[in-house]
């Protein structure tokens, strides 16, 4: 899935769109996407000027965005002005390796369960095959 299709499945835009490409998706099961991390990211201006590291909360947000794509594809839907997916929870978040400019952050998401508009996922972010972060994520679909 290229950036054009990603933009059709996520409401996020620059500077907050954190998924560049989807490599593999199995609706109802899993997604493998990535984010190219460059020194041009606006958050590197202050985090940290002499030792740039991607903030952990943005790694979690990138994982949540990939989970959102998976959810929309699993429902065979696209975002609408009447519906929103809220990032509803994070459990067991762990940060194992700093993510730096030049890294390609691979986002791996598996659906653990979905019930009544609430989705739970197992999420991992990897750089060069090494675990950078992991968490259990929860999102909730709500009508506006």
Curated annotation (Swiss-Prot):
Among NCBIfam families, the record links this protein to: fabZ, PRK00006.1
Similarity field: Belongs to the thioester dehydratase family. FabZ subfamily.
Where does the UniProt entry say this protein principally localizes? cytoplasm
Active site: which residues?
47
Q: Where in the cell is it found?
A: Cytoplasm
This chain's protein is named 3-hydroxyacyl-[acyl-carrier-protein] dehydratase FabZ
* Gene name linked to the record: fabZ
Q: Which EC number(s) does UniProt give?
A: 4.2.1.59
What does this chain do?
Involved in unsaturated fatty acids biosynthesis. Catalyzes the dehydration of short chain beta-hydroxyacyl-ACPs and long chain saturated and unsaturated beta-hydroxyacyl-ACPs.
Key words of the record:
Cytoplasm, Lipid A biosynthesis, Lipid biosynthesis, Lipid metabolism, Lyase
Provide one Gene Ontology biological process annotation: fatty acid biosynthetic process
């Amino acid at each position: 899935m290229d950036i054009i299709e990603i933009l059709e499945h996520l409401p996020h835009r620059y500077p907050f769109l954190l998924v560049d490409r989807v490599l593999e998706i199995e609706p109802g099961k899993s997604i493998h996407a990535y984010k190219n991390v460059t020194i041009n990211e606006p958050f590197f201006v202050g985090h940290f000027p002499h030792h740039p590291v991607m903030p952990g909360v943005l790694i979690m947000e990138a994982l949540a965005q990939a989970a959102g794509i998976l959810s929309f594809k699993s429902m065979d839907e696209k975002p609408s002005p009447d519906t929103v997916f809220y990032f509803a929870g994070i459990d067991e978040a762990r940060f194992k390796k700093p993510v730096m400019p030049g890294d390609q952050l691979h986002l791996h998401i598996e659906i653990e369960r979905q019930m009544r508009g609430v989705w739970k996922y197992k999420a991992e972010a990897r750089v060069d095959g090494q675990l950078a972060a992991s968490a259990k994520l929860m999102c909730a679909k709500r009508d506006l």
